[in-house]
Amino acid sequence: MTIRKLCAALFCACTVLGLVACGGGKTPPAGTGNMTEGSDVTTRSEETTSAETVSIEEGTTDTALDTVAEDTTEAETVVKDPHPTAKLNLVMAHDQMAERLVIYDMDAYAEGKTLDDLELWSVPTGHAAGLKYRENSVFGDVIVVAGSHSAIYAYPSGEELWGTDQPGDNPHSVELLPSGNLVIASSTGNTLRLFATSALLEGKVGTANRYTDYALTDAHGVLWDPEREVLWALGSHELKAYRLEGEGKRETLAEIPDMIYSLPEGKYWGHDLSPDYTDTRYLYITVGACVLRFDKETGAFSEDFSHADVLNRTNIKGFSNNPGGSFFASGETGGAGTDWTDWWKASWCTDSIYYAYNDEAEGFRVVKLASSESAFYKIRAFCGRYQ
């Protein structure tokens, strides 16, 4: 039996029995935190080295992590092309209005087309913010999301392999580590939350729900770097790197003191963290004022990068390029181009996505595509590579 089928069978069995477990336990690194039995963490230290572990005994259950909402499990996964990975210019976006994740085929773009015309694949996810496609040795091809319902979805079937509900912490970003463990960055919770999801490989569903929290103020972004073997994490005022310690379900994070970088003055409130798929030396970071490119070798931030003159805008929540050099960005927030009256839609979402690419006839071109019935937050190039 493949790990995907095993995970799906275990999750479905637990859902039928109403036994979606909460918690689980790794012992936190010495001096980094306290273990809490069977409950969510209620207090968090602002010290950047702190960690807290939530734990229950093997085989016991707790319903604090809610089961998947009926409206998401019963909705249909739409697949127009089950294997679009050969296509280059695909972009993922989460539509917070429709509560679904959508893949758009930008190679099908032509004058007069809207985003709706380019839709290739979708899956119902609930209200989510962070999203990534990963080709993982443990789970296979999957899409991971972070939000009111954070989950691992098999791709292209859309089948949920694992999920948890923790909306109060306001999850913003997610990363699936090579080990199969999952990290979720939560802004209100001010944490990086490391779930032991690799335990699903051993058939231990309860253990997979165990997590350890690591404090990071207003955590918004998280990204694994296979070249440097560190986990990058973005908060409101700084970018940090963590190394992984331990293996499998006992894996932990350790902050690297000499890899903490303060964001430039006046360029605070990090929103998005993504790789530069054309050069592993760099990362892209969005803040309220602009888009920054971070140099891993020098530790410097810059607003100058390829085509920055047309791409660098304010109030961009999501920004990503792909290996072919195309760029994708969510449209400006603040109600630009919309007639929304609900404040949340105009504050952090947009109805449009920028697609920037090299046109053989016209050179580098930027088009803005909209879907009037959508509300996008973060977007991401559909690429299974970490960088």
Would you name each region that the model predicts?
Residues 23-32:
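Bacterial lipoprotein signal-peptidase II cleavage site
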Residues 87-89, 139-141, 179-181, 227-229, ...:
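Short coil/turn segments that connect the beta-strands within blades of beta-propeller domains
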Residues 92-97, 142-148, 184-188, 231-237, ...:
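Conserved beta-strand positions in repeat-built beta-propeller and related beta-rich domains
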Residues 113-124, 159-165, 206-214, 254-264, ...:
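A short beta-strand motif characteristic of beta-propeller blades
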Residues 115-151, 156-175:
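Blade-loop segments of beta-propeller domains
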Residues 126-137, 168-177, 216-223, 265-276, ...:
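Repeated scaffold domains used in trafficking and secretory/extracellular systems
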